[in-house]
Amino acid sequence: MSNPKQLTFPWNKYNKSSFDSFYASKLNKHLLSLLQNNTFKDDLLIFGTKDSGKTYLLQALCNYFSNQGKSSFYLPMKQAKELSVDILESLESMELVCIDGIESIVGNKVWEIGLFNLINRSLNSENRLIFTSSKNIDVMNFELKDLDSRLRKIQSHELYALADDEILSALKHIANLRSIELGSKEAQYLLTYANRNISDLVQILESLDQLSMEMKRKITIPLIKEVI
């Protein structure tokens, strides 16, 4: 198989995900510190709810590696499993492999074996594997017991979703990083009337920023009403 970074996949697209723009709550600061520690090279299994930011974090980690001139590969398992399991071949040659959503292949014998084989090959290389899942390994129930055993030996960390009282701080943090002027009243209005999912809020924020520039208007509550 060709070097993975030479191939084009439907999920490969430029993104600006970065650790700086990931709002780290108190509960997540230790995990963020581990991921940015170049001397910490253990494999990790990160689990958390749908809205905890697992995908963003993996993409930020890949960008972090790329910015240091290191090879990285991001694989969203839910999409990848529709392709041939051969996609896993040679991934151990990458310095970092991030596999997102491994719960998607529970019960899929071919993919469970493929993932198990990748982990085994990686034991003999210097690459690093980072997995994410919406569930703790204790409740995933992989049919391949050898895979289950391998994953249980990997250090696991929970990525906690933002608490309600942290969402406002996160929204302001992201707005400041992107030089978007968002007043306190406007931010509070967004939290009151829009979906409080941080990824949805960021999409709304980006739409507001674009619209405000096109209309040469500040982001106000009337403008927010036009978007949401």
Model-derived regions: residue spans:
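Conserved P-loop NTPase "ATPase switch" module shared by AAA+ and STAND
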Residues: 90-112, 118, 125-134
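Short glycine-rich substrate-engagement loop in P-loop NTPases that contacts/grips substrate
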Residues: 65-96, 106-112
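A short, basic N-terminal segment
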Residues: 1-37, 213-228
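Short conserved motifs of the RecA-like P-loop NTPase core
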Residues: 181-194
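Short regulatory helix/loop adjacent to the ATP-binding pocket of P-loop NTPases
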Residues: 137-152
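Conserved AAA+ ATPase "SRH/arginine-finger" region at the nucleotide-binding site
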Residues: 139, 154-166
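The conserved phosphate-sensing helix
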Residues: 194-208
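Walker A/P-loop nucleotide-binding motif
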Residues: 40-58
